[in-house]
Amino acid sequence: MASAKAVQLAHSIDPEYKVGSMILAVTIYPLTPNPDDIIEVMELDNEVYLFSDVQALGAYPYYAKRVFEEKGVQLEISDEDREALTHTVDFVSFSYYSSNCAAADHSLGEPTGSNMVPTLKRNPYSKVSEWGWQIDPKGLALHPEPAVQPLPQAPVHCRKRLGCQRHPGAGRPR
């Protein structure tokens, strides 16, 4: 709601202003080819991108009700709120950090230690930095497609980050 009202205010000040949102981009692979793992990835993607979908599309996506019910959230939204949400961002930007895997059976795989999605697993095909971040440049190439399919505008990639140790005078980490 705050995003929609900020967009509305900015556009009322100057219709030429471009207002965007920024999301954390996470490529999530199924841990195995088990169809249940693929469904787990689809459900996690829905949760990860739910709010950027609202900001870019101006309404809650079809799956939001199910996600909220599963989390015990009761969304109270008025007609006035629904109208306000129509003030959508002009672009969605994203910051890609790493990829992960997911499995329907949460006991499988090595946990990543993610504080945002604790059920995520390490990708056994990715190298890992000394800080435990998975190194997966191909994940960046694969990421935008599922996340932005419903969006009316192309995404803007703002940065690629990697958690690693930096040493003064040693130059950029590789």
What is the meaning of each model-derived region?
Residues 1-173:
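Active-site region of glycoside hydrolase catalytic domains
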